């Protein structure tokens, strides 16, 4: 018995979770296809690190994000070598550092049991292991957020750590400006938790560094903030606005796309979103908290998560720029929501009939949302499987399928029907889980720990299913023909492209965002800076001179560049560009270029030169 009490079971479970997280992250780092944001950040950052251009420089590269989003990965490549492999290995290091900070914080807030739970939530999350293993700013920001919270969250933090955390919060904002709302919340929390002296140090240090960053890049850094402010109220900032009609401004995006984006977010972040909602509903009264410090930490974390969630939900779902960014945007700040859950449930809950009823409704909504994510897999099946009783014209008792009801009564298109069917299937599974939870609690199969409370036991059951289902359902889906050789194949294709273009050539780029990182392997060639974006640098209308100053371009400029370029890199699927214009024009000569093994999992690029 003495050995059993000392056996480090929780520690072993935690370590196994960490090992699984590392293993899955390594897999995704070596197999995930590159995306436009990754390539654009890496390429622009490398150009900035080499001193060829500077962030916010007129007639340079479009700096639509805070400077450190480019400079940090840029200098990593400048110091350790340019390429996708080097950048992703750095992203892995940042991811593992973040995980260590999360473990430290959950231990502080909830103890080692919660630390083990959180470790496995990260390890089983496809979203966490895939996003944080790519060279994207989400991983940088999440790591900074985690460690500034290590420095500032809780009682009796040393003043030096409070100042360090405050400075790190500014560095975080200068990596992604969308985290700006966190700055005042952190300073207010430090005043509240650590007192006036610590608060003044926090305010002074963060304000000084914030001003210093702006002084370095003044005045063009105001491009970051001018787009957030109403143009009618701030005409004095028009010099920092491109005053252009972007291509995405003309898109017509239907509500189905928004609904599916929400479903993706629920599937990717089920534990955090559902757990956060449950923690709000069951939030314990102030007198039940173990300490005032934990209560203050929970309030701060909850307000931070809600503020950032609302801000990023508006930016994604209610704007045209990136509807499908609802889930990726949450990767910046989901740590705050996770720590809120730990903080609340490690201090107990407050339950009542009203809270219980509200919790059931919320859980069923999340179950329906999770079900709707799988509409392509279970949509058609659900339309036939779900049956409603009815009496036919002959007075006979029979059944009608959900598909028949939605077709003949509501006249809905098949795509909508499949989403409704999948959501209803998810809700029915949720009802089944409620019944299972009631049976377990009713017959006292769980008598200790969190199982003593029916509401918390039910929430735990839903969270368990929401964590386990995605990796189980998606097993094998992430494999590509390139498998874990993707980085090797990408490097081979990048070097082959570099070998095909002579030094000092002026290159016209019309590749996809997934191809941008191939440019990292090219030295001593010149590009038209506005073309090197993830597709967002193109505008439909605007003054050409003004656009060029901001690093943007339109059709008129594109035609001019086509006339002056030496080499042309073309992707067949590029909008407003027809590959046949180059293949059938005698002015352009095809250049032999073989993407070799990368062509198994990536679209082919075509290379031409001016005759």
Indicate where each model-derived feature is located:
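Short periplasmic/luminal acceptor-recognition loop of GT-C membrane glycosyltransferases, typified by
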Residues: 483-488, 498-539, 565-573
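Perimembrane helix-loop-helix junctions
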Residues: 2-5, 151-154, 158, 162, ...
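Membrane-lumen/periplasm interface segments of specific transmembrane helices
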Residues: 24, 195-284, 301-315, 366-392, ...
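Specific aromatic-rich, kink-prone transmembrane helix
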Residues: 101, 121, 140-157, 163-169, ...
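Transmembrane-helix motifs of polytopic, lipid-linked glycan transferases
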Residues: 89-110, 143, 147
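Short acidic/glycine- and proline-prone juxtamembrane loop motifs at membrane-interface regions
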Residues: 35-36, 127-140
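Membrane-proximal lumenal/periplasmic loop motifs of glycosylation machinery
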Residues: 26-36, 50-71, 78-88
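Hydrophobic, aromatic-rich transmembrane alpha-helices
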Residues: 262-295, 299, 337-347, 356-360, ...
């Amino acid at each position: 018995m003495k050995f059993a009490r000392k056996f480090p079971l929780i520690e072993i479970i935690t370590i196994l979770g960490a090992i699984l997280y590392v293993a899955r992250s390594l897999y995704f780092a070596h197999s995930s296809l590159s995306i436009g944001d990754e390539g654009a950040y890496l390429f622009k950052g490398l150009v900035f690190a080499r001193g060829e251009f500077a962030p916010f420089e007129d007639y340079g590269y479009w700096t639509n994000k805070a400077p450190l989003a480019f400079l940090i990965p840029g200098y990593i490549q400048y110091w350790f070598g340019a390429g996708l492999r080097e950048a992703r290995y750095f992203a892995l290091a940042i991811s593992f550092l973040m995980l260590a900070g999360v473990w430290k914080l959950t231990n502080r807030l909830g103890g080692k049991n919660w630390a083990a739970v959180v470790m496995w939530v990260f390890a089983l999350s496809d979203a966490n292991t895939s996003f944080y293993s790519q060279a994207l700013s989400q991983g940088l920001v999440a790591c900074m957020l985690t460690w500034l919270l290590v420095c500032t969250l809780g009682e009796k933090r040393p003043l030096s750590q409070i100042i360090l955390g405050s400075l790190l919060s500014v560095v975080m904002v200068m990596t992604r400006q969308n985290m700006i709302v966190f700055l005042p919340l952190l300073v207010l929390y430090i005043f509240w938790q650590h007192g006036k002296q610590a608060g003044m140090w926090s305010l002074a240090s963060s304000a000084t560094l914030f001003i210093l960053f702006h002084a370095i890049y003044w005045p063009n850094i105001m491009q970051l903030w001018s787009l957030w402010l109403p143009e009618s109220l701030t005409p004095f900032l028009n010099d920092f606005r491109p005053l252009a009609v972007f291509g995405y401004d003309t898109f017509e995006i239907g509500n189905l796309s928004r609904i599916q984006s929400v479903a993706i977010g629920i599937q990717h972040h089920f534990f955090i979103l559902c757990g956060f909602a449950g923690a709000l509903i069951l939030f314990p009264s102030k007198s039940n908290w173990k300490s005032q410090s934990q209560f203050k930490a929970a309030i701060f974390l909850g307000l931070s998560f809600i503020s950032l969630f609302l801000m990023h939900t508006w930016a994604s779902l209610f704007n045209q720029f990136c509807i499908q960014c609802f889930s990726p945007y949450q990767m910046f700040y989901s740590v705050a929501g996770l720590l809120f859950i730990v903080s609340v449930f490690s201090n107990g809950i407050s339950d009542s009939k009203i809270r219980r009823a509200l919790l059931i409704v919320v859980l069923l909504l999340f179950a329906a949302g999770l079900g709707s994510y799988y509409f392509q897999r279970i949509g058609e099946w659900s339309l036939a499987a779900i049956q409603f009783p009815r009496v036919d014209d002959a007075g006979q008792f029979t059944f009608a399928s959900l598909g028949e009801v939605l077709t003949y009564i509501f006249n809905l298109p098949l795509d909508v029907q499949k989403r409704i069917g999948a959501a209803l299937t998810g809700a029915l599974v949720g009802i089944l889980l409620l019944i299972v939870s009631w049976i377990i609690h009713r017959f006292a199969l769980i008598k200790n720990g969190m199982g003593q409370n029916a509401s918390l036991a039910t929430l735990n059951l839903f969270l368990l299913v929401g964590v386990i289902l995605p990796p189980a359902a998606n097993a094998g889906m992430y494999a590509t023909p390139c498998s874990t050789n993707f980085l090797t194949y990408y490097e081979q294709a990048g070097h082959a492209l570099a070998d095909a273009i002579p030094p000092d050539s002026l290159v016209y780029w019309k590749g996809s965002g997934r191809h941008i990182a191939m440019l990292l392997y090219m030295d001593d060639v010149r590009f038209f800076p506005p073309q090197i974006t993830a597709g967002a640098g193109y505008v439909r209308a605007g003054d050409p001179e003004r656009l060029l100053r901001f690093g943007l371009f339109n059709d008129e400029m594109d035609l001019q560049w086509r006339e002056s370029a030496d080499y042309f890199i073309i992707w067949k699927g590029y909008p407003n560009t027809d590959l046949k214009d180059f293949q059938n024009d005698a002015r352009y000569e095809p250049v032999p270029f073989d993407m070799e093994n990368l062509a198994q999992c990536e679209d082919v690029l075509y290379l031409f030169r001016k005759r």
